[in-house]
Swiss-Prot record:
The name this protein goes by in its record: Glucosamine-6-phosphate deaminase
Class of this enzyme: hydrolase
GO molecular function, one term: identical protein binding
Species this chain originates from: Corynebacterium urealyticum (strain ATCC 43042 / DSM 7109)
InterPro entries noted in UniProt: Glc/Gal-6P_isomerase (IPR006148), Glucosamine6P_isomerase (IPR004547), Glucosamine6P_isomerase_CS (IPR018321), NagB/RpiA_transferase-like (IPR037171)
Length: 257
C-alpha cells in the first residue's frame, strides 16, 4: 500500500486526477465513486478534459446505487455522477454503467453488473472513498472480502451520514446494490481518497490496523496495487507519517506521480 499525504483536499484531488488521467488517456476502464470526497477530483478531471483529455475510449462503472430510486431521482447515483461529472466530459453513449437499483430481482441486477464488468475486460483503476465506519462502496462492517455485487442493508451510521443529502433520515433508502469487496479487489489499481478530520480514525484503521471484515477498507492492505491519498487532517491519527513522507520524497523516477 502506498500512502501519500498532501496538505489540502485540493492537492489530494489534483494528484488523484493526474493518476486517473493516465488511465483515461490510454482508454482504460475506470471505476467511479460518489459522495463528497471525489467531487474535487471530478472537477480536476473536467478541467483536464477542457485542456484536451478525452474520455471517448473509456468505459466507467459506478460502485453502487440505492435500491428504489429511479435514475432521474436527484439522489440516485446515476443522476449524481451525471450531474457532477459525466455530462461535462465526452464519454460515449452507454459507456457509463450503474447498478440497476430499480430491478425487482436485485440478485439478477448484481449478477448482470458483474457480467458487464467482466465483458468490458475488468476495471483498471477504481476510485474509492471511505466511510466513517470504514465502509467502501456500500460494503458495511462484516462484509466478506470475497463478496460480489449484491444487495446490502445500510448501516444506521451510514444512513445518518447520508441524511444531509436527502433532507431527513427517513428519506434515506435502507437498501443498496453495491460492488462487493471481491469485485473491488479485482480492479488493477485501487485509489482511495480521504479528507477531513472526521475520516482520520477510519484512515488510521484501514492503513495501520488489522485486516478485518469489521473494517472493510482494510482490504486494501491485501491488494497488489493500492494507493491511499489523504490530506493532513485525515492523516492526523497515522503513526508512520514520517515514513510515508520519506517514501514519497524519495521515489525512483519510474514510481513518481
Amino acid at each position: 500500500m502506498d500512502v501519500v499525504i498532501r496538505q489540502t483536499p485540493k492537492e489530494v484531488a489534483q494528484l488523484a486526477a493526474t493518476i486517473m488521467a493516465r488511465y483515461v488517456s490510454e482508454g482504460k476502464n475506470i471505476g467511479l465513486a460518489t459522495g463528497s470526497t471525489p467531487l474535487l477530483t471530478y472537477q480536476e478531471l473536467i478541467a483536464k478534459h477542457r485542456e484536451g483529455l478525452s474520455f471517448a475510449n473509456t468505459t466507467a462503472f459506478l460502485l453502487d446505487e440505492y435500491v428504489g430510486l429511479p435514475e432521474d431521482h436527484e439522489q440516485s447515483y446515476h443522476y449524481t455522477i451525471y450531474n457532477e461529472f459525466t455530462q461535462y466530459v465526452d464519454f460515449a453513449d452507454g459507456a457509463v454503467h450503474t447498478p440497476d437499483g430499480m430491478n425487482p430481482r436485485t440478485d439478477e441486477a448484481g449478477r448482470e453488473y458483474e457480467e458487464a464488468i467482466e465483458a468490458a475486460g475488468g476495471i483498471d483503476i477504481q476510485l474509492l472513498g471511505v466511510g466513517t465506519n470504514g465502509h467502501v462502496g456500500f460494503n458495511e462492517p462484516g462484509s466478506s472480502f470475497d463478496s460480489l455485487t449484491r444487495l446490502k442493508t445500510l448501516h444506521p451510521q451510514t444512513r445518518r451520514d447520508n441524511a444531509r443529502f436527502f433532507g431527513s433520515l427517513e428519506q434515506v433508502p435502507i437498501h443498496v446494490i453495491t460492488q462487493g469487496l471481491g469485485t473491488i479487489r479485482r480492479a488493477g489499481h485501487l485509489l482511495l481518497l480521504a479528507t477531513g478530520e472526521n475520516k482520520a480514525d477510519a484512515v488510521a484503521k484501514l492503513v495501520e490496523g488489522p485486516v478485518s471484515a469489521m473494517m472493510p477498507a482494510s482490504v486494501l492492505q491485501l491488494h497488489r496495487h493500492a494507493t491511499v491519498i489523504v490530506d493532513e487532517a485525515a492523516a492526523s491519527q497515522l503513526q508512520e507519517t514520517e515514513f510515508y513522507r520519506f517514501v514519497d520524497a524519495n521515489r525512483p523516477e519510474w514510481q513518481a506521480y
